[in-house]
From Swiss-Prot:
GO terms for molecular function: RNA binding; tRNA pseudouridine(55) synthase activity. It catalyses: uridine(55) in tRNA = pseudouridine(55) in tRNA. Responsible for synthesis of pseudouridine from uracil-55 in the psi GC loop of transfer RNAs. The lineage of its organism: Bacteria, Bacillati, Bacillota, Bacilli, Lactobacillales. This is tRNA pseudouridine synthase B. InterPro entries: PsdUridine_synth_cat_dom_sf, PsdUridine_synth_N, tRNA_psdUridine_synth_TruB, TruB_C. The keyword Lyase does not apply. The active site is at 42 (nucleophile).
Amino acid sequence: MNENLNGILNVYKEAGWTSFDVVAKLRCILKTKKIGHGGTLDPSVTGVLPIAVGKSTRLLEYMEAAGKIYEGQVTIGFSTETEDADGAIVNQTPVKNNLTESEIDSAMSRFVGKIKQIPPMYSAVKINGKKLYEYARAGQTIERPAREITIKSFVRTSPIDWNKEEGLVTFSFKVECSKGTYVRTLAVDLADSLGYAGHMSKLQRTASNGLLIKDAIKLSKIEEIQESGKLSTILYPAEYAVSDLPRVNLTTVQFDMARVGKKFAQSDWTNEVETADSSVNKTKQQEYLLTDLSLLTTEKFAAFYNDKLVAVYMKHPEKEGIWKPNKVLV
């Protein structure tokens, strides 16, 4: 077993693989059990699957919580039981000739921001201790509570393609969204807002945790690289796991506090002269010093010292102006 590996892999998940399949295969390739993924992709979905290896698996919760970018395709004219191209058709509503690109664009813009979304029946969301897809496979449809998600952007990226014979309209899109977003449900809801049935006919994740589709590597290639002894050349540093969090650069005094799990109070640093190093920032996070804590709008921040991730801090749930360690990594 190789338990010394540590870092993040940008894996290209191919169609037909579950996210767990990828993890299981990598455990064999890398000969280590300490592997986990940073956000599930459905089997038919391709693209970026961030993988944490070694000690970086302690950061999986932040990887999973990070926003994601997807590119895909919506087909308007019929819906399926799984809301994607794999499911059986359940409703057909041939599209009329008067549906315009401007109507579609206007409808898409109304989904941007904080919205409520009901998770699909074919999903791993648990209700009463049972996954929704288990109910669905048993022919049951149950009530699901709506969940709040955030859509940062949702735009059409191609002209609409008319299939007048079948009454179908297809177009490509790009969406940047928060954790917990079901993009196939977004496609269904978009079509419904236009007065038609619809589904997501194609999807690829193009970015996650600062990792991009152009740099993603297939499992077969990772196996070749591992066999050649050059895996370190494709391992990203652990800080990519927290690329969605603001970065706070610590001074030596503050680092000594963080490494032993001490809390930070904003009031303690308002008059300090900061000399924290910020010479390198690979993930292009917005940088702060402890004097800037009052400017943060997030519940957590990533603490760095000499360009190394040392801890993740979170707002104290009961004490105003106090930040406590959520995870110490040194």
